């Protein structure tokens, strides 16, 4: 089982990395999902996510999440082949937590160097995005 800290990691890169690990049969736990970042213009990102929310309605989808852990989980799921059993089972092996839960030991947590933000000017965390969407 891999425990990955999502603090200061790029949202899309982390999702792609985790999706690959899940398809290889690993169990993955992601902690601190609210501290993952999306790079780009803040206003553009917020408008893009709000536009997605406006597409669906209460009775008819698509349904887009508003909380940080569900936003990250949805992006991982979008990178998996959901129509076949292999993809569904892979997504079931993924657990995403907003913060560090008590049942996860902090000694085994690893940071993935390939997906870290270095010197990026425009970023927004999933927590800030969630507040803008009304999820927190």
Swiss-Prot record:
InterPro entries: Ribosomal_uL13, Ribosomal_uL13_bac-type, Ribosomal_uL13_euk/arc, Ribosomal_uL13_sf. This protein is one of the early assembly proteins of the 50S ribosomal subunit, although it is not seen to bind rRNA by itself. It is important during the early stages of 50S assembly. Belongs to the universal ribosomal protein uL13 family. The lineage of its organism: Archaea, Methanobacteriati, Thermoplasmatota, Thermoplasmata, Thermoplasmatales. It holds the Pfam family Ribosomal_L13. Part of the 50S ribosomal subunit. Keywords: Ribonucleoprotein, Ribosomal protein. GO terms for biological process: negative regulation of translation; translation. CDD domains: Ribosomal_L13. This is Large ribosomal subunit protein uL13. Disulfide bonds: none annotated. GO terms for cellular component: cytosolic large ribosomal subunit. The gene is rpl13.
């Amino acid at each position: 089982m891999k425990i990955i800290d999502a603090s200061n990691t790029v949202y899309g890169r982390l999702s792609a990395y985790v999706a690959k690990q899940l398809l290889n049969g690993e169990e993955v736990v992601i902690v601190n999902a609210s501290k993952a970042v999306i790079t780009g213009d803040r206003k553009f990102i917020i408008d893009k996510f709000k536009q997605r929310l406006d597409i669906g309605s209460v009775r008819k989808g698509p349904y887009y999440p508003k909380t940080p852990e569900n936003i990250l989980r949805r992006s991982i799921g979008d990178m998996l082949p959901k129509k076949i059993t292999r993809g569904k089972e892979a997504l079931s092996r993924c657990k995403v937590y907003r913060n560090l839960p008590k049942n996860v030991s902090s000694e085994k947590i690893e940071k993935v160097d390939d997906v870290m933000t270095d010197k990026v000017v425009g970023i927004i965390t999933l927590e800030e995005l969630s507040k803008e969407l009304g999820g927190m």
